[in-house]
Amino acid sequence: MSAQTLSSTESSGSTLTRVLNGYARLCAAIARLCMVLSVIGVICLVAAVSFQIFGRHILNNTPTWAESLSLLLVLYVTMLGAAVAVRDAGHIGFESLADLLPAAGQRRLQIVVHLLVLLFGALMAWYCGQLAESVHHYKIPNLGLSEGWKYAPATLSGGLIVLFSIEHIIALLRNQKVVPAWH
């Protein structure tokens, strides 16, 4: 093998490494952003529910929009948190089967699991997107927003689950671990 071919191979390897490391950094940044948005959503949720309680018990005039807003915020907080839980391995898992396998078998099983999670995320994004599109003409009572906004967080979460599952598969193939976004 000539020196030029070897140099070209090393260069493409380092370029691939940079791209994969950049992808991991991008996924970590997206996960942190999702968590920040979830925290802001929880704060807004607490404020909306508190205002609803204040209006009902102190002012004797319940703000009708507060409950609808609270339900919508719960969807966003939950779906963003679920996507980040996939990335940061915060979801429920059963390790007993994996523990019985040799190291190579454990890695293969983990890849299969992440492929299944990726498939689930893709289907969730696709079908929730279809639902959002089918109801976008209708309005959420008391908010005046399109009903499609109820399905947007699940669509977004499905897309993020796909991105984060790809990150896990790449990390497993490189014999690395995904570093949780908050560490």
Residue ranges with predicted function:
Residues 1-183:
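Alpha-helical transmembrane segments and membrane-interface helix-loop junctions
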